[in-house]
Design a protein with these regions (language model features):
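Short, Lys/Arg-rich flexible segments
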Residues: 1-81, 112-180
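Short, internal acidic amphipathic alpha-helical interface segments
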Residues: 79-125
Length: 180
């Protein structure tokens, strides 16, 4: 190592630890985030109403399909894991071909609602629960903060690589507020 002072020793330790953190984020933590998002989608999106205009794809190509919840950039870098949902609209599942939403980010349309900050609108206008925001990403973050499974996953990922760690702190969020 050759460190002559604490500052150099910490810099060396950081350099050794960063790739291990990124690896744990890209494997163990990513899987926990995907599972939590799929759960949140069921709670905040699918349980909100039953569609009449289209057939839901659910976890078979739809918003809750874990294959549509991906790591942006393919891996965590510099201690940051970015997870996005890339689900496309479902023109094949509509009951009326004149009323199909295409050419828009379906996750953002659902997350932020009709006529959101990007100007996305459903192509079929009517009143309904689907027009309102159904913030599944926010619910995912709140769930993870409360449960802490991502922290345990990080610890397990570091352990896999021979790094000992200890979890400290706790959540003070009320579970009753997670999905209501």
């Amino acid at each position: 190592m050759g460190a002559t002072n604490i500052k150099e020793a910490l810099a060396y330790a950081n350099k050794q630890l960063k790739p291990k953190i990124d690896s744990a984020l890209s494997r163990e933590v990513y899987q926990v985030v995907v599972d939590a998002e799929a759960f949140s989608i069921d709670e905040k999106v699918y349980d909100t109403y039953r569609p009449l205009m289209y057939k839901r794809r659910g976890d078979m190509g739809g918003l809750a399909d874990k294959g549509n919840i991906i790591m942006k950039g393919g891996k965590a870098t510099n201690g940051v894991l970015r997870v996005i949902n890339i689900t496309d609209p479902n023109p094949g599942g509509v009951l009326n071909r004149d009323r199909v939403t295409v050419g828009k980010s379906l996750p953002e349309l659902i997350e932020y609602g009709n006529n959101n900050r990007w100007g996305y609108k459903y192509d079929f206008q009517s009143k309904g629960a689907y027009m309102k925001p159904r913030p599944f990403t926010e619910a995912t973050v709140r769930y993870l903060r409360y449960v802490g499974s991502h922290v345990l996953a990080l610890q397990n990922g570091l352990k896999r690589q021979g790094v000992k760690s200890r979890i400290t702190g706790s959540s003070d969020e009320n579970l009753d507020d997670l999905f209501f």
